[in-house]
Design a protein with these regions (language model features):
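Solvent-exposed interaction surfaces and binding hotspots enriched for charged
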Residues: 1-102
Length: 102
């Protein structure tokens, strides 16, 4: 879950907000933002994850790799649960469900 204490959020959010602005600007400069966006997001997330892990622990070890893989898996699950599923539920209501799901 992406939840940390408010005090920690206040400490790190300004840097995250600045990074978001830079990423938005970079992607919007491109002709096909929908093509560029996934690569930029992947690059930034990977650099942050590996950079923090190496900065804290010094070198890669199995527990770090397992932890990082688990975190990215949880991010995917949480994003789907909180954002994609409600979006899809709305589309079912507006466009109709598949007959095969009945």
């Amino acid at each position: 879950m992406p939840y940390i204490p408010q005090s920690q959020r206040q400490e790190i959010d300004p840097a995250i907000d600045q990074l978001i602005e830079q990423m938005v600007s970079l992607v919007k400069k491109q002709d096909q933002a929908e093509r560029i966006f996934p690569g930029v997001l992947n690059y930034v997330c990977t650099r942050i994850a590996l950079g923090v892990a190496k900065g804290v622990f010094g070198r890669m070890r199995y527990f770090l790799l397992a932890s990082l893989a688990g975190v990215f898996s949880n991010i995917s699950s949480e994003l789907y649960r909180r954002v994609a599923a409600p979006y899809e539920d709305g589309k079912i209501i507006s466009d109709g469900d598949l007959d095969e799901f009945d």
